[in-house]
């Protein structure tokens, strides 16, 4: 036991204590009225009227949660989310520091594995700090599954290309919440054989979750996949400041609860741009160090509703920035995800549809940051293409300049006689 490890554990304990105190002392942000609904003579379920839409497969997965008392379940969820944050930090750092795949690697002779780069800061310190990132904080506070889904996806993406069943976990994550399905399209479009295989596996896994849901809950599955999945307003009000998607940004900026065609057109453009940038990152660098954050941010932007706790992908984004030595940019990103500015704007009634221009910035920090990241990636791609074109032009000009042939001098008499 070293002093450094003791300080790290102390920092984590202090952070958890502060988190517990905050949870116990602060007033609840939402008042949810639970009403028991009798479903049998000795049983009842509780109707919380929560604004959420998930495939029936998700309901099947959460059946074991009903076996625990509520107090025990709360403790399990809090401790589990803290452990998942530690896992996400390790996976993010491993992903951000891995080397590009060798182009000569094949399934029979895969590229040799490299030793993982150790995390430069003790993990308990990073967990203690990460708990106060707003998306992580709200995931722990509300018992959300955002950290679990992010860990599933990132674990699958960091596995070797030849790993058995790579892509299966991504399909499971997409079967629980539809937003991760964009990762399947990303894998299929990279063009790398390993990614394409993983994408096909993920697609098969997603279809499997749909079939399982249809087998266990046939009526609910039919209702969800034919009706509910198209109700973009079902999860909640688009104009709510808690909705940090592109639809929420448009609804608040246009002062309308239904942004309509403009938002839909922007989503199409952002989707294609994000997929192109992510694919380009893989083709150019041999790995998806920037491709995965680009896809994650794109998925969160184009989803009709992206609650703030969905943005736990800020952890991999920070890991990539720190791995590249972009300390100032990482500090700005951490500040944006810790400031909680969208909680400062009025929330009563339809007040979020009447925000002034400067309040718009406070109300939409995450989508604005995501758009800035995608714009920066697009600018970097443009600069790289421009430099490559100039280099190719210069090489072509050098190749076009051929040396002039030397004039042939007549042979002298002495040399001619010698030759004879």
Protein language model features and the residues they cover:
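Enrichment for repetitive, rod-forming helical segments
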Residues: 151, 184, 316-317, 347
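Aromatic-enriched
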Residues: 22-26, 322-420
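Short basic/hydrophobic patches in alpha-helices and adjacent helix-turn junctions
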Residues: 63, 252, 299-303, 318-324, ...
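Transmembrane helices and adjacent periplasmic/lumenal helix-loop junctions
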Residues: 170-187, 302-310
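Active-site catalytic microenvironments for nucleophilic, acid-base chemistry
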Residues: 67, 187, 191, 319-320, ...
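Hydrophobic/aromatic-rich transmembrane helices and adjacent perimembrane loops
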Residues: 308-323, 367
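Primarily membrane-embedded glycan-assembly and transfer machineries that use lipid-linked glycans
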Residues: 1-107, 113-166, 190-311, 354-361, ...
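Contiguous hydrophobic segments
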Residues: 144-149, 175-178, 241-254, 326, ...
